Amino acid sequence: MWARAVRFGLRSWVAWRRGFTSKADPQVAKQVRTRYPHSPPHSPQGNGRVSAQVIEHLERLALVDFGSQEAVARLEKAIAFADRLRAVDTGGVEPMESVLEDRCLYLRSDNVVEGNCAEELLQNAHRVVEEYFVAPPGNISLPKQDEQEPFSYNH
């Protein structure tokens, strides 16, 4: 009987130490340290607007063509969302191992179970050169903005 009490006491201490809790330990739930800030995020730093020069630069780096106003609007929404995430005050917040705070997760050992299957993997490639995957053949840099068809960014 005392072994069970020690085991539950030790489990409660380990759960408290890691910042995890379970429904079986109501005493630990009162002491649990959460790993996310309780205060609301600060106001965003920018409005998400992107200049035509930045869009051209991103198109050349990412080999993506933002050919419509809808694509530019989607990019601006993504940047505004990233600005909101950047504005969150994370000072004093411990790094998390998992988003599941209520259970202890154990990592599996990293063992190789199969190997030397390069030939099998390369069979899935569209194009192979000397045992290497080749990037998609359409992956060429975009022409500069003055060489492209006119497009108005309305900024």
From Swiss-Prot:
Cellular component, GO annotation: glutamyl-tRNA(Gln) amidotransferase complex; mitochondrion
Alphabetical GO biological process terms: glutaminyl-tRNAGln biosynthesis via transamidation; mitochondrial translation; regulation of translational fidelity
Record EC number: 6.3.5.-
Keyword list, A-Z: ATP-binding, Ligase, Mitochondrion, Nucleotide-binding, Protein biosynthesis, Transit peptide
Root EC class: ligase
Catalysed reactions, semicolon-separated: L-glutamyl-tRNA(Gln) + L-glutamine + ATP + H2O = L-glutaminyl-tRNA(Gln) + L-glutamate + ADP + phosphate + H(+)
Annotated function: Allows the formation of correctly charged Gln-tRNA(Gln) through the transamidation of misacylated Glu-tRNA(Gln) in the mitochondria. The reaction takes place in the presence of glutamine and ATP through an activated gamma-phospho-Glu-tRNA(Gln).
Subunit structure: Subunit of the heterotrimeric GatCAB amidotransferase (AdT) complex, composed of A (QRSL1), B (GATB) and C (GATC) subunits.
The name this protein goes by in its record: Glutamyl-tRNA(Gln) amidotransferase subunit C, mitochondrial
Organism per entry: Canis lupus familiaris (Dog)
Originating gene: GATC
